Amino acid sequence: HGEYRRQRQMCIRDRSLTLFEKIINKEIPAEIIYEDDVSIVIEDINPQAPTHLLIIPKKVIPKLSDASNEDQEILGHLMLVAGKIADQLNLDETFRLVVNNGAKAGQSVFHLHLHLISGRPLNWPPG
């Protein structure tokens, strides 16, 4: 078991950083709207609406389905940040939060993030 653990730690240590980790680490620039100890909010570089923000936890959770019980506080925090940002931007309770889980659902960066979308009619069902 010791060798397995050592190799697993090497894989974790040697993996390349996601785009969001590089933004969180200030290695690449982004339009930061909000930041606290747990999360960061940036403008989407490919907006699908007049307002399209990404709410990203600083802890790396690849997909929502990878979240564990210990992530409950982080997940709740992301929702509260979304509400706070929507209020600050005067979105008048007219916005949508989206989480894509996995490539087939449209997830392109494997670091959990919420899309906050507003500023145009949002049809149902989405997609």
What are these regions (language model features)?
Residues D92-P125:
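C-terminal structural segments of small proteins and small subunits
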Residues H1-I12:
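Single conserved hydrophobic/aromatic residue that forms the stacking wall/gate
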Residues Q72-Q88:
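Long, well-ordered alpha-helical scaffolding segments within enzyme catalytic domains
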Residues K26, V41, P57, L78, ...:
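Divalent metal-coordination and catalytic microenvironments
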Residues R13-R15, L19-I24, I117-G127:
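Conserved His + Asp/Glu catalytic blocks
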Residues R15-T51:
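N-terminal first-folded block
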Residues I55, K59-I74:
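Short histidine-centered catalytic/ligand-binding loop motif
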